[in-house]
Amino acid sequence: MLAAVPGEAADVKELFAIDLADYPSKEGRMIEVSYPPGAQDVVHRHDAHAFVYVLEGQIVMQLKGQAAVTLKAGQTFYEGPTDVHVVGRNLSNTEPARFVVVLLKGKGAPIQTPVKE
């Protein structure tokens, strides 16, 4: 499960997982993340190529060394394997937000690894 601010846990559902035959040490995973109002992730990395598609609400994403971006339904975001995700939060304190993430990662590697700043 993705970690969020205490009391505001993100709900994560695995939608799909597959071993990638052309890349024996890799796997593909698809997850749906639901942020309750005001939820915010801890600083983390994915050690994966992560492709984000926003389904509902608005989220703020920021990678270390880059500007924060606000995304709404229908917009996308990318995180590379070496990126540190310093901001991931629901922009709204009253409405939920949902997004899908497709991860191309090492087989058996965790979906998320917390990073201390």
Residue ranges and their predicted role:
Residues K13, A17-S25, Y35-P36, G65-T82:
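Short acidic-glycine-tyrosine-enriched beta hairpin
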Residues V5-A9:
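Sec/Tat signal peptide C-region and signal peptidase I cleavage site
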Residues Q40-V42, V60, F77-N90:
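Histidine-centered metal-chelating micro-motifs
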Residues S25-M30, H49, Q66, T82, ...:
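Extracytoplasmic
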Residues H46-G65, A73-Q75:
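Glycine- and acidic-residue-biased ligand/ion/polar-headgroup-sensing regions
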